[in-house]
Amino acid sequence: MKKYSIYMLGLLAAANFVNYMDRMVLSVMLPSIKADLDLSDGQLGWLTGMSFALFYGLLGLPIARLADTWIRKHVLSISLLAWSAMTMLSGSASNFLQMLVFRIGGGAGEAGCIPTSHSLIADLTPPEKRAGAFAVFTAGATLGLMFGLAFGGWLSTQVGWRWTFVLFGTPGLLLAALVVFTLKEPERGQMDGASVTAKVSTSESIRGLLSRRSYLHLLIGFSVTNFVSFGFMQWMPTYYMRTFDLSMTTIGLLMGFGVGALSLIHI
């Protein structure tokens, strides 16, 4: 791989790191947020699950479609700015509704990270090295998950959950600037010996995907897996605190390095 391709891959992996770091830090701070905002477990469920996942899932395809037709570094930088701003604003929430809006905004913003990055990686790495490039990109998510849980738990005990959100949202703003000013837009299809000239409608794209049985099997499998794994990761810190009376620092370290290490082995 050329030096620029390596730099680009590192930048995209860093964006994915921040993506999962910001996504997971909420879970280790739920007990503090619940106490400060006087929330019920049902409301916490909306914040950790439906509010984020619904808009993340619904906007994934439209944003992926936008990445197919527009300048991808702009799509990625706007996504970074959006979810980072929502993460920082979460620290200002004074009630459930405000936090809900910020979580929805975070899910909408993060929906643009993975599809746009995958498209860029495919056009900057040859087919024989693409699997390794995607593994590096995915490792960024795993490390971000580890950091969000482990460091987020400790930081929240030092500066409180509000400032933790602000500090966690800041790196994404810096990455957005790097994406805008240093990322080059590669020619679509250049690594596969093809150029993209024909325009395909969104409905045609969706029909094409749904007609592939292998895609449907993967879609169902990943949906079920993520339903279980993210539900587990979002609620286990609260369970450990209530059941074993552990501190947020201890819980963050256990969850971050425990789950993160298993994820890295899986990669």
Per-segment meaning from a language model:
Residues 38, 71, 92-98, 109, ...:
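Helix-breaking motifs and short loop linkers at transmembrane-helix boundaries and internal kinks
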Residues 265-267:
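Conserved small/polar residues in nucleotide/adenosyl-binding loops
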Residues 102-143:
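Cytoplasmic helix-loop-helix junction between adjacent transmembrane helices
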Residues 26-27, 213-260:
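Extracytoplasmic gate region of multi-pass secondary transporters
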Residues 29-58:
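Extracellular/periplasmic helix-loop-helix junction of adjacent transmembrane segments
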Residues 137-181, 185:
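Helix-loop-helix hairpin linking two adjacent transmembrane segments in secondary transporters
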Residues 58-97:
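Conserved MFS/SLC helix-loop-helix module at the cytosolic interface between two early adjacent transmembrane helices
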Residues 187-219, 242-243:
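Juxtamembrane intracellular "pre-TM" segments in multi-pass secondary transporters
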